[in-house]
Amino acid sequence: QDSNNPWAISFGVNAVDTRTSASREGLNWFDQHFSQLFDVKDNWNILPSVSYLGVSRYVGSGFSVGLSGSVNKIDKAVYFNPSAPGHDPRGMIVTNPGDLMYYGIDATAKYSFMELIKSKVIDPSLSLGGGYVFLGKDSYGTVNPGAGLTLWFTEAIGFELATKYKTSFGNREDIYGVIDSPSHFQHSAGLIFKFG
């Protein structure tokens, strides 16, 4: 986005990974949050359809602000239980919590490095925002640091990849140690159109 095309609309597919909340003692911070990050088959929840929509506006000096909404279905919840049947070597187990519906609403401020690296195609970015998640019967706020990469096919059409670490304000555990309000990664891939 830029002053010539300050508005952008994006849409595509999102994936939710709750593995980051299944941390256990004895692991360093990096392993607690990033081990199995790309275990798509076992840990990622993906709806096979358009599942996020965003709108944003350029405000100057590489910064833009935006709102987005997403929907998903959580049929893979990861938690730490080394005594449960089927756990992996680290004691993690994946269960279906009951096909919980996931709805997310997020506000984000993003900084694009495109002008800094003097590119017209490659557009890396960092973002920070806040949001609210509705997960089954629970709802909770999140703080969302993130990173993204957009590849612009033309001046106005691009392919966008992004990830956010949605830090929960309410990691409440039930009697089985399963987190009701999990922090999680949300990854997205889709098309972005900018206009003015």
Stretches found by the model and what they are:
Residues Q1-S56:
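Short glycine/proline- and aromatic-enriched beta-strand/turn motifs that initiate or cap beta-hairpins
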Residues D2, T20-R24, F30, F34, ...:
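Predominantly the C-terminal beta-signal and adjacent terminal strand-loop region
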Residues N5, I46-S51, D99-I105, I122, ...:
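Residues that define the transmembrane beta-barrel architecture of outer-membrane proteins
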Residues A8-S10, V16, I105, A109-K110, ...:
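Outer-membrane beta-barrel "beta-signal"
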Residues F11-A15, L67-V71, L126-Y132, A147-L149, ...:
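Transmembrane beta-barrel strands of outer-membrane/channel proteins
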Residues D42-N43, L135-K137, Y176-D180:
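Outer-membrane beta-barrel proteins
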Residues L53, A107-A109, L126, P145-A147, ...:
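Membrane-embedded beta-strands of outer-membrane beta-barrel proteins
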Residues S56-V143, F193:
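Gram-negative (and chloroplast) outer-membrane scaffold detector with strong preference
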